[in-house]
Amino acid sequence: DYSSLETKKLHAAAQIAQEGADKEIEEYLSKFTFPSDESKKLTKIALLNYCGAAILMPYKLFHTECKKLKYDLELLQNTFATSFEQVAHRVTCLQDPKLPGIPFHFLRVDMAGNISKRFSLSGIEIPRYGGACPRWNVYSALTRPGIIQAAVSKMSNGEKYVCIARTVE
């Protein structure tokens, strides 16, 4: 098995979530109409993975550490003994109106520019199909593995976003 320790921990936490919240998740999913059984199954997996991440990085504690560490993703990675990608994904979830975090967006992109994972709670519009804007620093990060690159992206509507990019192993 070639999975990293962090990936194994997330899978174990998702299994714990399934044991503890399977009934509630099934009940929640029953409120929606899915185009196929497969799409319902994938949605359930996504919810279980979300619960798994919440077990490893509980909301209040994670939010507190984000503020304390000024959203330094590598320090958060070390603090919670998780992967960089898991931390990057988790910061996008800090959207509780009672305890909000900074709005983040998240992309996972391969060497060919294909987007394989996307979350945008920052307001930035990420293409649903194809690749992201070729000027985004996500592509230049591929030329400098393991090094965080920061850039300010100015959109056509005048909105500005700070974008960080880094390769993950």
Each predicted region: which residue ranges?
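Conserved binding/catalytic microenvironments
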Residues: 1-169
